[in-house]
Amino acid sequence: MASLDIHLYVKKDLTYGECVRVAKEKYKIIHRLLYISIIFLFLNYVVDIVCYVKNYNGFSFFCWVFLNLGVIGIIITVIIYYISIPKPDAESEFLNKPDSLNQNVGESQSNEPPKYTSTFMDELDKQD
């Protein structure tokens, strides 16, 4: 059975990109844990039905207690993972950093031709 490793990040000066990367990793783990808890809840309902029919014999009661403790443990682990996600201090530096030359593509929606710098236009005029 795989063990769950909880990594707490103590580093205070994470950049926005590092915070996003860590948050994505933690959200993947949280989603997996929530899927496991859904399976545990489904099994818990099956055991509840069996216990209702058989009036709680020893093994079914043990399974019921084990599944309930499993669901509670998973919920506590999800809360710990959610709390340990680092929050970025300054996201504006990361968001304002130009990633490419086409960063402001959505701003120019008109049919006008692109504006060139004056030096480039001067060179074109000289060639004619």
Curated annotation (Swiss-Prot):
Polar residues bias (residue ranges): 99-120
Membrane topology: Multi-pass membrane protein
Residue spans crossing the bilayer: 33-53, 61-81
GO cellular component: endoplasmic reticulum; membrane
Annotated disulfide bonds: none
Keywords: Membrane, Transmembrane, Transmembrane helix
Region (Disordered): 99-128
Subcellular location(s) of the protein: Membrane
The protein, known as: Putative uncharacterized membrane protein C622.07
